[in-house]
């Protein structure tokens, strides 16, 4: 039986098939993406470089001598490759376990195609078992938490974490997310919220799902 790490490695390798020649690609953040970066290093001569969604991924890319571009220098990205904490059958996701959700959402928004790489444990019928991360301006933390309670959630400050943008993360427990697009818009309209970890309005276009019998490609 394959371990979770072996499933992650399988999808990381499969993702190379979706990397166009001579392109600048978007690269996400997290344990599965770290494996993808290791694989990407083997074909780095085929690409121009990458736009990164976090300081951690930037450091890892640079360690492999892959050129990292500022997003403001890049007009478009053909593809963005990132993991997910949960993903449903409609390819809506919860992301932000690594606290990079805002930059991930920005880079994903620029890309023509979003490729999600995940193992089968992340594939769910309903989002919400994984606590929903919300990036919040620090002075608004208590207000935003009260508003999230009104939506039926139980927000908890992620201790000791400051995002790359200098903000805090509230992890919202206890949500059964029936309508991800609507909830994403509702939370994002709360004053003080930078963004929430629902990726439903900009969902994945392709899911590379690591399973015991191989990598399944879902669209």
UniProtKB/Swiss-Prot annotation:
Family: Belongs to the ribose 5-phosphate isomerase family.
Documented EC number(s): 5.3.1.6
Catalytic activity: aldehydo-D-ribose 5-phosphate = D-ribulose 5-phosphate
Function of the protein: Catalyzes the reversible conversion of ribose-5-phosphate to ribulose 5-phosphate.
PANTHER family found in the cross-reference section: RIBOSE-5-PHOSPHATE ISOMERASE
Keyword Isomerase on entry: yes
The name this protein goes by in its record: Ribose-5-phosphate isomerase A
Pfam family, one: Rib_5-P_isom_A
Keywords in alphabetical order: Isomerase
Record SUPFAM superfamilies: D-ribose-5-phosphate isomerase (RpiA), lid domain (SSF75445), NagB/RpiA/CoA transferase-like (SSF100950)
Pathway: Carbohydrate degradation; pentose phosphate pathway; D-ribose 5-phosphate from D-ribulose 5-phosphate (non-oxidative stage): step 1/1
CDD domains xrefs: RPI_A
Subunit structure: Homodimer.
Catalytic residue positions: 104 (proton acceptor)
Membrane-spanning segments: none
Keyword Isomerase: yes
Alphabetical GO biological process terms: D-ribose metabolic process; pentose-phosphate shunt, non-oxidative branch
One MF term in the entry's GO annotations: ribose-5-phosphate isomerase activity
